[in-house]
Design a protein with these regions (language model features):
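Extended, low-polarity segments enriched in aliphatic/aromatic residues
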Residues: 2-61, 71-80, 85-374
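Terminal amphipathic helices with adjacent charged low-complexity linkers/tails
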Residues: 66-67
Length: 374
């Protein structure tokens, strides 16, 4: 497969030029205007942020993309699907309230917001996975599959189960209905290292399934209740909660890539990722830790695989921030350094598996040419 082109611009802004101006210029250079949008529904998939989290993308960025679509005669809407776990985005009403509280509405974004899998997270379509190895079909939010054109607008950051969250995670996990998310997560569940557990109860507070109790001041997981979402792993400050089988994370990664294939196959797609506020964990948390790496810039491509690879490569070249989770890990005596910021931030992850599987099934290529836009 030939190299894909990924376009990049940094966050440096001379007087009179804003980040929003640069984002618009980036999208145009990357070819968004080559898509025929006249009279067509355009799904712009993004994450509206959990209440309390401040690392999610600002709605101003979404408006740039929505306005570009409208300029081309498109009918854009912002979308995301409900979460597997309880929180502020587990059903459409609370999800819309959360989006509004985090600044997403028709005024700030220039378009409507539609929750992709409906009121209860059950409005889904079973979509074939072309070349699927682990998933023959995927359960995707109905509204997302109803769109004629699909655009992903992703916040690239760390993730406690997948290493990082970028375009493929935003598409694959994010577009899955609640049942679709369960299908992806079903392969792996965390364990407790009782020698390290301090009984602080942070994992229990983070668990949305009421699956963690305490016996003799040590956490205990009820696997009949556990959904395998991994939020408890990110909640623990002492690395007491871990995935006992790294292959489970790898299977999650590969399923996620196949779900992304189901979403993108057979229609025009365009992908944008902003590498900023690079927190160590997912924006699904009701908080965000300090960034582990400095802000890098904005990337865009028709190829989500090349896009994620380019973003990952840029992060791996960056210098870790000392006063951060990653900085603290690297400063620990005896810490096993992987020379990989994602693995040093969240051990027992296999982030390359997502890209490998996506390339294997024909979603895109990891080989890319980077073109810089000023």
């Amino acid at each position: 497969m030939e190299k894909s082109t990924v376009y990049f611009t940094d966050f440096r802004c001379p007087v009179g030029t804003s980040q929003l101006d640069k984002l618009k210029k980036l999208c145009i250079a990357a070819g968004i205007k080559d898509i025929d949008m006249e009279g067509k529904f355009v799904a712009i998939k993004m994450h509206f942020g959990e209440l309390g989290n401040m690392a999610f993308l600002r709605p101003n960025y979404a408006k740039v993309v929505a306005d570009l679509c409208k300029e081309q005669g498109g009918l854009p809407f912002l979308t995301d699907c409900n979460t597997l776990y309880p929180g502020s985005r587990k059903n459409a009403l609370e999800h819309l309230d959360c989006a509004n509280l985090n600044g997403f509405n028709t005024i700030t974004t220039g378009c409507q917001i539609i929750i992709g899998d409906g009121l209860r997270g059950t409005d889904e379509v079973e979509v074939p996975v072309v070349n699927g190895e682990y998933c023959k079909t995927a359960l995707i939010g109905h509204a997302i599959m109803d769109a004629d054109i699909f655009i992903s607008l992703s916040h690239f950051k760390g993730h406690e189960a997948t290493g990082f969250g970028g375009a493929l995670k935003n598409i694959g996990m994010g577009c899955g209905s609640r049942a679709g998310k369960m299908q992806q997560h079903a392969s792996g569940k965390p364990a407790i290292n009782t020698d390290v557990c301090r009984g602080c109860r942070r994992c229990a507070k983070e668990c949305g399934s009421d699956a963690i109790s305490y016996v003799d001041k040590k956490a205990v997981i009820d696997y009949d209740k556990c959904k395998g979402c991994g939020r408890c792993i990110g909640a623990c400050s002492f690395d007491a909660v871990y995935n006992p089988n790294s292959s489970a994370n790898e299977l999650l990664d590969r399923k996620m890539a196949e779900y992304a294939q189901a979403v993108c196959h057979g229609r025009p797609c365009f992908h944008i990722s902003l590498v900023q506020d690079i927190s160590p964990n997912c924006d699904c948390h009701g908080e965000n830790d300090a960034p582990i790496l400095p802000d890098i810039g904005m990337f865009a491509s028709f190829d989500p695989v090349a896009l994620d690879q380019a973003c990952a490569d840029a992060c791996l070249k960056a210098t870790p921030i000392e006063n951060s989770q990653l900085g603290e890990h690297l400063a620990q005596p005896g810490w096993h350094c992987h020379h990989d910021h994602f693995k040093d931030s969240n051990p027992n992850i296999e982030w390359e598996a997502t890209l490998d599987q996506a390339e294997k099934i024909g979603l895109g290529t990891r080989q890319y040419e980077l073109k810089r836009i000023k």
